[in-house]
């Protein structure tokens, strides 16, 4: 490369054999560069790289010698190609950042935050945390005439206007009302129009469809009287069984066995009715037989008379 750069100029004849001394065809006029080209080929390429053009050596009929001669002649034997548009340094555009600065992408704006201010004085802070009150005991059955409180204990007062700040427990005034509890049908002493202390009786409430008051369970009947009557007057074998079942009913009631008492009561009733039915049937049959015998006796007497 250094030998090519330091070769003889075109005015000195070449001593080497052809084709070095062959005449060269006329070269195309080069595009004038924006600045004066440097003397060396290395600086020539460096300049055109900076100015946006590239210089390519033109190959003629002389092969490598033509290329060397063209390199010595410089711009007269080279073709200049324009630099692509994307390699050209862009000029400063309107609103563009200065060179050497990086542009960050625009982020979406922050969501809108609404800050509400409450006018007026804030409610006082709640009192110090205290242990919660124990749960109220479950209501139990009480004797007639006792009262049952509807609220257990005092729980505070409600502030004026009925406004309760959020986050504060609701406080109510202690209730002093008591509801008297009386069984249905029991007399109680109350303030009636007749005067204080007058005893009155609550009427039973009206019963709707499907509503019934629970009444105490009645003990089963022993059917002892009808068992004795049927034993004496009607049919004594079944009557004795009915009396025995009636005694079992009383024994079961004495020990509190209602189921056995009900079973024995039904059996005593059935045997008593059997004794009654057998006794009635026997009376009817005896009456019929008596009538038949009387009629037959009269007919026999008439037959034997002269």
UniProtKB/Swiss-Prot annotation:
Disordered: annotated segments: 1-144
Membrane topology: Single-pass type II membrane protein
Gene Ontology terms describing biological process: learning or memory; long-term synaptic depression; long-term synaptic potentiation; protein localization; protein localization to cell surface; protein phosphorylation; regulation of AMPA receptor activity; synapse organization
Keyword Metal-binding: no
Keyword terms of this UniProt record: Cell membrane, Membrane, Signal-anchor, Synapse, Transmembrane, Transmembrane helix
Known function: Required to maintain a pool of extrasynaptic AMPA-regulated glutamate receptors (AMPAR) which is necessary for synapse development and function. Regulates AMPAR function and synaptic transmission during development but is dispensable at mature hippocampal synapses. Plays a role in regulating basal phosphorylation levels of glutamate receptor GRIA1 and promotes GRIA1 and GRIA2 cell surface expression.
Protein's UniProt name: Proline-rich transmembrane protein 1
Organism, scientific name: Mus musculus
